[in-house]
């Protein structure tokens, strides 16, 4: 019984609702002023914040390297340490280190640049040259 009454009320109200929608519904001014934008718009904000210091970059890279199980001795992590010769990492480990550095500093290192990073000092030098690194 309730279902029948609800369906009858909906049929009776349908023309009135349709005409109100066609006529337009008044919207508040703040709703009308909002521009239509794409569903997702990536925006990167820059500020004049402090630039990374060399010792800070080195300590963060050393922390990343010390998290790798394959580093033969964490005491060997120095500013001039070579990933393969001094730390005992192979080429795949070096790729993983570069990826971890990308994640640590929120940057993307192109493959041609990543191929040149084989030591801590090269990694520090590269990070310092990137204005997006944080």
Swiss-Prot record:
GO terms for molecular function: acyl binding; acyl carrier activity. It is found in: Mitochondrion. Transmembrane segments: none annotated. Complex I is composed of about 30 different subunits. Residues 55-131 form the Carrier domain. The keyword Ribonucleoprotein does not apply. Carrier of the growing fatty acid chain in fatty acid biosynthesis. May be involved in the synthesis of very-long-chain fatty acids. Accessory and non-catalytic subunit of the mitochondrial membrane respiratory chain NADH dehydrogenase (Complex I), which functions in the transfer of electrons from NADH to the respiratory chain. Belongs to the acyl carrier protein (ACP) family. Pathway: Lipid metabolism; fatty acid biosynthesis. Pfam families: PP-binding. GO terms for biological process: iron-sulfur cluster assembly; lipoate biosynthetic process. 4'-phosphopantetheine is transferred from CoA to a specific serine of apo-ACP by acpS. This modification is essential for activity because fatty acids are bound in thioester linkage to the sulfhydryl of the prosthetic group. Gene3D superfamilies: ACP-like. Keywords: Electron transport, Fatty acid biosynthesis, Fatty acid metabolism, Lipid biosynthesis, Lipid metabolism, Mitochondrion, Phosphopantetheine, Phosphoprotein, Respiratory chain, Transit peptide, Transport. InterPro entries: ACP, ACP-like_sf, PP-bd_ACP, Ppantetheine_attach_site. GO terms for cellular component: mitochondrial [2Fe-2S] assembly complex; mitochondrion. Its main location: mitochondrion. This is Acyl carrier protein, mitochondrial. The modification O-(pantetheine 4'-phosphoryl)serine is found at residue 91. Residues 1-46 form a transit peptide.
């Amino acid at each position: 019984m309730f279902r029948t009454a609800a369906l009858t009320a909906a049929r009776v109200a349908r023309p009135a609702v349709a005409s109100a929608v066609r006529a337009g519904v008044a919207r508040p001014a703040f709703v009308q002023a909002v521009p239509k934008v794409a569903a997702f718009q990536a925006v990167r904000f820059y500020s004049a914040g402090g630039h990374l210091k060399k010792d800070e970059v080195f300590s963060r890279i050393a922390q990343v390297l010390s998290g790798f199980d394959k580093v033969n001795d964490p005491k060997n992590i120095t500013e001039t340490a070579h990933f393969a010769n001094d730390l005992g990492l192979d080429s795949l480990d070096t790729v993983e280190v570069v990826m971890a550095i990308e994640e640590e500093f929120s940057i993307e290192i192109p493959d041609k640049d990543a191929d040149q990073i084989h030591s801590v000092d090269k990694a520090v030098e590269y990070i310092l040259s990137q204005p997006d690194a944080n």
